[in-house]
Amino acid sequence: MGKYFGTDGVRGVANKELTPELAFKLGRYGGYVLAHNEDKKHPQVLVGRDTRVSGEMLESALIAGLISIGAEVMRLGVISTPGVAYLTKEMDAELGVMISASHNPVADNGIKFFGSDGFKLSDDQENEIEALLDEENPDLPRPVGNEIVHYSDYFEGAQKYLSYIKSTIDVNLDGLKIALDGANGSTSQLAPFLFGDLEADTEVIGCSPDGYNINEGVGSTHPEALAKTVVETESDFGLAFDGDGDRLIAVDEKGNIVDGDQIMFIIGQEMAKNQELNDNMIVSTVMSNLGFYKALEAEGIKSNKTKVGDRYVVEEMRKGNYNLGGEQSGHIVLMDYNTTGDGLLTGVQLAAVVKLTGKSLSELAEQMKKYPQSLINVRVTDKHGVTDNEDVKAEMDRVEADMNGEGRILVRPSGTEPLVRVMVEAATDEKAQSYAQQIADVVEEKMGLDN
């Protein structure tokens, strides 16, 4: 991570950390680095946003910065992050920009860039933008007079994106009753329209954004709200999106949460059956549940683990030409159709599996037995040296032997704080908690901040 760019673009409290001044500079310098094409006088840039009240303020500043460098800007309005990624590639734009802080609270906002291929930026591209941000007055082009171009609105872009999502399945969803939760964010209008157009009967919550209520008690980070709705309305299942629509968490007809691991397994199983799963491989992160790997093994499907973060999943998928990957948190990447996690796309694919198999979502999800998980954070003096400590290693080996293949240990440093996360999965809740505590106690004793 750089000085400005985190794992998913530039984020901060809007108007305090992510100010209009910074948004202007990101537009100007980001536009120069990513869209400045010697052969094209006015590179095309697409800009979308979620429903946060600060979005319009940052959008105006960002667009001003882009126009100041000579870009021709098309404003997409409220749309999902994967919608921007898809349209950038589909419309041969030089650059796509999304203004959103995803599942974060309303006070936060963020700016993330997509290259002309629809993928997020490389580290080198981010470093180049950061270098310009740190310069006082970089000598960059400044068009004047009739060289300055108007920006235009292309709100029809959302419909173009939805038509594409609809085309990725060969079945209508008539006969299915689906509860939808738009997190009062980017998918609030998109999701009901899409699933209605596919002839599903829909129940809707979290689709009344007012600029302030994004992710508030709804969406993929609060699936309990949708679970209640699914049970009360006797829906076949529910789909909960996050604020910018790049994640999906589902709920079965009984109100049970179906997470990203289970969704990947269900879709991957169907793809493998139809011989559509490249190299019979699914890419996930180290945080995926042990039950996920055991279920894949039973199906003869291979798995590949990356560091936590959807950008690492996408990197691995591109490297190996794999077409399914994702995270337990609900970022699912279906590379045949889009370049980034896409909640609406994943929801449509999952619904199609339910329709085509004739099975309930609970039946499909039950094929993957989730192992109970316990997570303990320990503040330490050296977060990167914990797994090299002999006492910690010995305790991990002891617990590993005790679990006898019916569990998993993961001890990893936090990306942002001076702590390590001790995660244990075991056959029962009690065992997971007990084993995690035993390891955490040794970490605390040998390397804790207070010792």
Swiss-Prot record:
Names of required cofactors: Mg(2+)
GO CC list: cytosol
Cofactor binding note from Swiss-Prot or TrEMBL: Binds 1 Mg(2+) ion per subunit.
Swiss-Prot/TrEMBL keywords: Isomerase, Magnesium, Metal-binding, Phosphoprotein
GO molecular function: magnesium ion binding; phosphoglucosamine mutase activity; phosphomannomutase activity
One of the GO biological process terms: UDP-N-acetylglucosamine biosynthetic process
Record's catalysed reaction(s): alpha-D-glucosamine 1-phosphate = D-glucosamine 6-phosphate
Active-site residues per Swiss-Prot or TrEMBL entry: S102 (phosphoserine intermediate)
Residues engaged in binding Mg(2+): S102, D242, D244, D246
Pfam families cross-referenced by the UniProt entry: PGM_PMM_I, PGM_PMM_II, PGM_PMM_III, PGM_PMM_IV
Main enzyme class: isomerase
Residues with the Phosphoserine modification: S102
Post-translational modification: Activated by phosphorylation.
This enzyme's EC code(s): 5.4.2.10
PROSITE patterns in the record: PGM_PMM
NCBIfam families with a match to the protein in the record: glmM, PRK10887.1
Family, similarity comment: Belongs to the phosphohexose mutase family.
Function text: Catalyzes the conversion of glucosamine-6-phosphate to glucosamine-1-phosphate.
Protein name: Phosphoglucosamine mutase
